[in-house]
Amino acid sequence: MNYFAGEYDVAVVGAGHAGIEAALAAARLGCKTAIFTINMDAVGNCPCNPSIGGTAKGHLVREIDALGGKMGKTADECFLQSRMLNRGKGPAVHSLRAQIDRRKYSSVMKHKIELQKNLDLRQAEITDIEKTEGGYNLTTRMLAVFKCKTVIIATGTYLGGRIFVGEVSYESGPDGIFPAAFLGSSLKKLGLPLRRFKTGTPARVLKSSIDFSELEVQKGDEPPQPFSYETENLGENKVECHISWTNDETKQIILENINRSPLYAGKIEGVGPRYCPSFEDKIMRFKDKPRHQLFIEPCGLDTEEMYLQGMSSSLPEEVQLKFYHTIKGLEHCLIMRPAYAIEYDCVDPLAMNPTLEFKDFEGLFGAGQFNGSSGYEEAAAQGLVAGINAAMKVLGREPVIFDRSESYIGTLVDDLVTKGANEPYRMMTSRSEYRLVLRQDNADERLTPLGHRIGLISDERYEKFLKKQELKKEELNRLKSTVISPTDEVNEILVSRETSEITSGVRLIDLMKRPQLGYDALKNIDKTRPELDPNIFEQVEIGIKYEGYIQKQLKQVEQMKKLEVKQLPKDFDYNEIEGLRLEAREKLNKIKPLNIGQASRISGVSPADISVLLIWLAQNNRRQ
């Protein structure tokens, strides 16, 4: 028999990376919040790679931290090795990636939830979500009923989860944890547009069974950089990673056994991630490629498990062992956990507003892989957005919509709710048309004032941020006012850097504009340089060297914002507008964009359609 178990302002279903950020944000904003998980030992679990960040993902982590989220700080507390990716390219694509202790990360996140005021962590499987007059009733498998004003669904890959390893398949979530077996039918009954996606993970092998003498060593950066603006010193890297390569023999084993892959045998219906394919998928898609790289990464300091990055597979376990044994350094490796594919239910994100609230279900939000994305970082970013907006709804405050011109978080959400996701969506720097101004180094400058206004950034932290901005301004003024005289020492340094000598006094800022010169090259010339946070020097140097490009991109941002302020009616029938093409009418009626800017990014809506909309909007505004 069902029994009443309590009331909450915000209920979060799932305690993965999305659920955690959602619950912590809502609770910190003053809402009575509950976070439900099937297994409390899996809070903040990292069932795939033991790392946080990476290309574009590192940007998301910095932005989450700048807003007051917890992923970056927790990753710093659990870091094993840190590397800045894409250093050989421009600053727009520099991205931090850190190896983490996955068990410690889970434990630290769980403890943060337990300590958070206004937040209850509960082990319970939610089996039913029912719409009520004042919100939603959540029913658990133990028949407890919770009355909730708002609900955030963050079920990850657990919703209807099914594991595939060769000919074997069974219902399960990742890491052998029970799936959410009943909630999917409840959500379908409610009316949510569910579909099936698929992802996978590599095997874990025993460290002592690896011959590291055969492998290329991959060290971390020294000194390692943190994700969080609150972390002052990470210390030293604690581990090394290693690199190996597949070969023709590896490839041949895959080709001989491809019919045993459930993906190629047609047993998996879900759509897989384009940018994180299984190893057998790589072989089939890139048959001319002679070899593929893999990274061997530790899962923690208190475990002998090693993660084989780039070797996701759904082939039978004995086939996995065969092809691993063809790889240099892994000839005698022992599989501790086999690789597998997992299929799961997720929702069509076109059914959502940019707040991540469902258009047809007030007070119901989605976040993370449930929304059709992939990755821990994408999930955490959406969790923060959903948690903030669920709290805003409960508190009667204005919703917070993240603009794609101001953050990768905004780009991620806008892409999902405007363009949809026909496959697991992965964040990439190429998805942002404003990436030069959305760098990871200036995430605090872009988002910390917003985090403070919302209520997630403390006054103390905000004062530190303002002080940093003041120091940055002072440093820029110093570079403008400091003149370097043409001495033999100065010109010798300039020539050594393959740049022309000076014959008269030159400002430091003008020297800095030269491609060959930066803070490091000018350290023996710049006698009055103050002791500052390295991040300040980085931001100042980038601002100087890329000033023209940045100003050009800021003008593009302003042009787009002019379209973003042109609001469109929420429940309008676009069939009433003459001149719109049929495809445009169908897409506009389905997505219901909030403004002209969002409408312009919908696939199937042409510039000509936007012109028609602008004319109609001007006429409509005059009539009103």
Task: Give the predicted meaning of each segment.
Residues 3-7, 24-132, 142, 154-174, ...:
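Conserved N-terminal/central alpha/beta ligand/cofactor-binding core
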Residues 4-18:
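Beta1/beta-strand and adjacent pyrophosphate-binding region of the FAD-binding site
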Residues 13, 145-156:
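Short hydrophobic core segments
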Residues 39-41, 57, 84, 184-321, ...:
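An anion/pyrophosphate-binding glycine-rich loop and adjacent beta-alpha core
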Residues 307-373, 401-414, 533-587, 592:
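A glycine-rich dinucleotide-binding beta-alpha-beta segment and adjacent secondary-structure elements
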Residues 369-377, 433-435:
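Glycine-rich phosphate/pyrophosphate-binding beta-alpha loops
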Residues 379-400:
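Internal hydrophobic alpha-helix adjacent to the cofactor/substrate pocket in enzyme cavities
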Residues 431, 437, 448-453, 457-609, ...:
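Extended, charge-enriched "interface" segments that sit outside catalytic cores
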